[in-house]
Amino acid sequence: TKITAKAGDQVTVENNKDFFNYQAGLTFKPVENGSIYISYATSANPVGVDGGDGSEGITAAIQNLKPEEVKTYELGTKWDVLNDKLNLTAAIFRTEKTNTRATAEDGTTQNIGETRVDGIELGVNGNITEKWAVSAGYTYLDSELVDGGYTNVGSTAVPVYQANPSNGNQVQNVAKNSATLWTTYQVLPELTLGAGAVAMDKVYGNATNTKWVPGYVRYDAMARYNVNKNVDLQLNVNNLSDKRYFTKAYSSHYATEAEGRSAVLSVNFKY
């Protein structure tokens, strides 16, 4: 990452960090149509990567810090049922982020923060009958700010740093519950209709959990008509009810607003 101060300051700050990420997993198949797996993966978040959307300030004070490190542990299972037409999945996982940038006891910014997310994922995908297909999923995320560093409870002139009172709060922009449902049905050989919904819990925009955007449910629909074996027409309508909702909150005064009702008509060619 790189920042350049305002005109006249003539200050350029650069950060060049190398990091190595990897993943490993093991799968066991007790029967032909089922499997159980365990996996471990790492990733990294360089300094300043989130600065473009305003969720992270890009300042000279943080440019020499290490990348944030993420570790994910997962245990899950996958099963094919109904003659392999329908796939069922379930997983539990933990994601730990360390080296998070936070204020230290001396008032400087250091890699001392930590967050943790424990989650459950359930999924269904495939065909219930030859004409009826379904895709559904549910996710539960128990997120926590484990260590938010220190906060100044004194003044600028006489700072007094104490452990962050937001420790234990829900992590910003991590919904506790979310679910999706999409289903299609072949009404006629040439005509397929589909409908679905997306549900999301409220999310907080700050560590103190005092600013948030409410949860929402969005409904979508689709119609596809096969003109012949090579051409089909498809109409997708998103946010059928034209609901106003927000997908992300920030610690400042603004949030990310989602699109209103929209429609897309497409022509698909297959050869």
Give, region by region, the residue ranges found by the protein language model.
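Outer-membrane beta-barrel translocator domains and adjoining extracellular loop/strand segments
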Residues: 1-10, 48-57, 61, 100-108, ...
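Membrane-embedded beta-barrel scaffold of Gram-negative outer-membrane proteins
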Residues: 29, 35-37, 41, 64-149, ...
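Residues on the lipid-exposed face of transmembrane beta-strands in outer-membrane beta-barrel proteins
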Residues: 24-28, 75-79, 122-126, 136, ...
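C-terminal beta-signal and adjacent terminal beta-strands/loops
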Residues: 198-206, 224-271
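Signature of Gram-negative outer-membrane beta-barrel scaffolds
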Residues: 1-31
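Gram-negative outer-membrane beta-barrel transporters
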Residues: 91-96, 111-207, 241, 270
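Residues that define the transmembrane beta-barrel architecture of outer-membrane proteins
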Residues: 18-20, 69-73, 116-120, 175-179, ...
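Transmembrane beta-strands of outer-membrane beta-barrel proteins
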Residues: 1, 36, 86-90, 134-136, ...
